Every structure is written in structure tokens, then in C-alpha cells.
Amino acid sequence: MAIKAEEISALLRSQIENYESEMSVTDVGTVLQIGDGIALIHGLNDVMAGELVEFHNGVLGLAQNLEESNVGVVILGPYAGITEGDEVKRTGRIMEVPVGEELIGRVVNPLGQPIDGQGPINTTKTRPVEKKATGVMDRKSVDEPLQTGIKAIDALVPIGRGQRELIIGDRQTGKTTIAIDTILNQKDQGTICIYVAIGQKDSTVRANVEKLRQAGALDYTIVVAASASEPSPLLYIAPYSGVTMGEEFMFNGKHVLIVYDDLTKQAAAYRELSLLLRRPPGREAYPGDVFYLHSRLLERAAKLNDDLGGGSITALPIIETQAGDISAYVPTNVISITDGQIFLQSDLFFSGVRPAINAGQSVSRVGGSAQIKAMKKVAGTLRLDLASYRELESFAQFGSDLDEFTASKLERGKRTVEVLKQDQNKPLPVEHQVLIIYALTKGYLDDIPVVDITRFEDELNHWAESNATELLNEIRETGGLPDAEKFDTAINEFKKSFSKSE
């Protein structure tokens, strides 16, 4: 076959004309030192603060310390394969995580990568992890209740949508249980929940995920897990990743509940990173900006005004104390940032009062505006009753001669404590809470033995579901308190069929 020279030259000419020279210029640096999840890099002179850099094996790092001769980078992943002299290149982008509806029902790490073995997450939307909090004029005051389903909280320390309410207490006092119960109670409420597990055992995270799955709560929940075995940088960024995922829903007019479990471990991880980066230590060896670490996170929880869609993020940060010391550095910081705290006491927990909420030291700075009218009316005197009972209880230990008024106060107090007890993973609808608290405050439980109170409440709830549906529906739908006559009739009717124990 004859090859024509003209055809070859024409073909070559067309190929050369269509050739585009593509070159990309990237800043490249060299690893000077590596260890404990920190790398010192020489040569990345133009790197931005918080920029992602890429190591030769594909592992990413976060530029934290920008110094004259080197850059301190925290490594977001395994660093065993990185050695001195390795090449590092800039990516030109700051850290982002995937966001969107596709994340609901999944368990992801702080980088947004799935760790539940259910395949990739098909979302193309991302948001930067570090973002300025919503401005003052874009917010609205908190005026809408977020029902936790826990009587002691909804009655005494109510939480509103857009609020930051701290859960604080020693280890093993039921902090996570309160948070999980609140997530369970958001079923059918149109709230997206995000549970951020920081520095917990893998087995604990797995147990909590299973609890949510069995209750059907994973249908509206995202779990962000940075377990104890992960490098410190992942524990440090986990809460920011969680709130970034939540902001996507908030700016689309939805309500979000986010739980940070717990910020003590995040602060410890940040302290570790700061000391390794040779930043000067301050009180309790924490760096000087540990307040800003938590304030910039918690300020991102907000209730947006109606022009921006009226969405909200409600934050429940958890802090673990040592021997009830709430005056330590991190607890005092977070107490000053949040809109109130739920203080759990180990003494109460071990004496069988669960949830072990200390009503005297717990407070909600939003208060009554985060309660439905019915609850506000029936629970108005509850805190004072409980406080006076605790005071009288300590005096009553010293003498047996009590006047009738004091004795009746003590008896009412015992019943109040009993009513506020609640089993875990059994959140109670607000209409049932109003019913039992009305019965308590109006004296209907005064003639019921203390040992029967829990049974009385359970049976009253079952009875009301079939015999007082109008009353319950009115509370649920209007939020107002029905006529006292309706309550009195219903409770008296039930008491006729209730049998006290001998």
C-alpha cells in the first residue's frame, strides 16, 4: 500500500495545530521533621492559614503555624508513611466537607468520608469547615420550644430552637443518655439531628448508633465519629465538620439539633496539637486561644430571621468534669459561652434519681419563651418547690417534730422527685408531661404512696390515650392549657380505677 507524503504531512499539521500545552505550577515544599501527627515543612512560603497541603502518599495536612522559615502542619490521617525529605505540595483550597441530604442516616469521619461500610456518599456539595458565625442582624430571638421528652428538662430548664444548652457532669452520670433521648424525641418533629462523637471508644459509638437505628432515629440523624484511636487533628476538627453539615440544612430553612460529645476531649486534642506545634501554654497547659476554639464553634448555633428562612441550629455541647469541679478552665469557658447548663450530679445519680439533674445549679437563660403555654403554667412553681424541699430535707434529718405545713412540703417534695425520674430511651410527649405535672402541682398525688408514683404515671398515660384523647390533642395542637375542669374530671375519673399498693 502506497503512503502519500501529502496525507502524512496534513495529518501531522492538524495534530500540531490542535495541541494544547497544559502546565500547572504548584508550590512544593520538603518535610523537615515529622512525628506525633505534626510535620514541619520548608519551602511553602505562600501557603494560606488553614490551607490543605498534600503529601506524596495522598494524605492531607492542615497548615496551622506559619513561620518565617517553615510551616507547621497537622496531618489529617495516618502519618507512618511520611518521612523526612518527602515532597509536599499546596492544594490552594481550604478544608471542606461534603454536605446535603445524602449524609442523613450515615456514619462519617470528620473529613466526611463514610465509615459505616454502606458505600460512597453521592453528594457533590461541599462547605468550608471554618466559617464566620451568623451576624447579629440575621438572627432572631429564641421563641420556639425544642422538646427533649425529658420531664425534668422541659419543665425546669427548657431548651428553645437556636439555643446552646450545656450538659455538664462527671463521667457516668448520664450526659450522653440525655443527648440520645433528645435525638429520639425529635422523631416526626421535622428536625435533622447530628451526633458528633469525639474521642470515644469505637464500641461506645457503635452502641449509640445501634440505639438510634433500632429506634428509627437514623432516618433523620448524621453521626460524625472521631474515635479515641484517631489522630488528634481529627478530634479537633470533628465538631466544626458537624456544624458545617448542619448549616447546610439551617440555611435551607430547616431545624437542626447538634450534640458535641464531648468538648473536653476536643480541648485536650487541641492542647496536644498546640504543645506539639510549640505554642506557649497557659492555664492548665491549654493554649491562649482555647476560649476562641469553643466560642467560634458554639456561636454558629443560631435561630435565623424569617428573611433567611427561619432555620435554626440548636447545640447541646457536653463537658465532662472531674469530681464535680465546674470551676476548671474549660467548664467555666463553655458555661460563659452557652445560654444555660444542665448540671448532672453523681450523688443524685447513685441515689437513684435519674436523670440526675441538679435543679439548683441548672439554668436556661432563654427560660419561659422556650416553653409551650401549658407547660409554663403547670411547671411555674416546680423549681421553687424542689429547692424548698432540698432545704427542708437537710433540716428534717436533725429532728422528728415537724409541723403540719413542713411535713406536707416534704411529702410533696418526695413526690416531685419521683415524678421527675424517667427511664432512659423513653422520652415522653409534652402533653403527657403536662398531665402528670398538673396532677402533681394540684395535689392529686398527695394521697398516692411514693412507691406507687411511677406506676400511677404509667397507668395514667395509658388511660389518657384512650379515655382523654380530646384533652391530650388540645395540649398537643394548641400548646395552651385546657380548662382546669377537664383536667380535674379526667384525673378524678382515673383515680377511681387506680389501686394503691398496701
From Swiss-Prot:
Function: Produces ATP from ADP in the presence of a proton gradient across the membrane. The alpha chain is a regulatory subunit.
Signal peptide extent: none
Binding site for ATP: G169, D170, R171, Q172, T173, G174, K175, T176
Protein name: ATP synthase subunit alpha
InterPro entries, alphabetized: ATP_synth_asu-like_sf, ATP_synth_asu_C, ATP_synth_asu_C_sf, ATP_synth_F1_a_nt-bd_dom, ATP_synth_F1_asu, ATPase_a/bsu_AS, ATPase_F1/V1/A1_a/bsu_N, ATPase_F1/V1/A1_a/bsu_N_sf
Keywords noted in UniProt: ATP synthesis, ATP-binding, Cell membrane, CF(1), Hydrogen ion transport, Ion transport, Membrane, Nucleotide-binding, Translocase, Transport
Class of enzymatic activity (EC top level): translocase
Keyword ATP-binding carried by entry: yes
Catalytic activity, reaction form: ATP + H2O + 4 H(+)(in) = ADP + phosphate + 5 H(+)(out)
Topology with respect to the bilayer: Peripheral membrane protein
Taxon lineage: Bacteria, Bacillati, Bacillota, Bacilli, Bacillales
Family: Belongs to the ATPase alpha/beta chains family.
Quaternary structure and interacting proteins, as annotated: F-type ATPases have 2 components, CF(1) - the catalytic core - and CF(0) - the membrane proton channel. CF(1) has five subunits: alpha(3), beta(3), gamma(1), delta(1), epsilon(1). CF(0) has three main subunits: a(1), b(2) and c(9-12). The alpha and beta chains form an alternating ring which encloses part of the gamma chain. CF(1) is attached to CF(0) by a central stalk formed by the gamma and epsilon chains, while a peripheral stalk is formed by the delta and b chains.
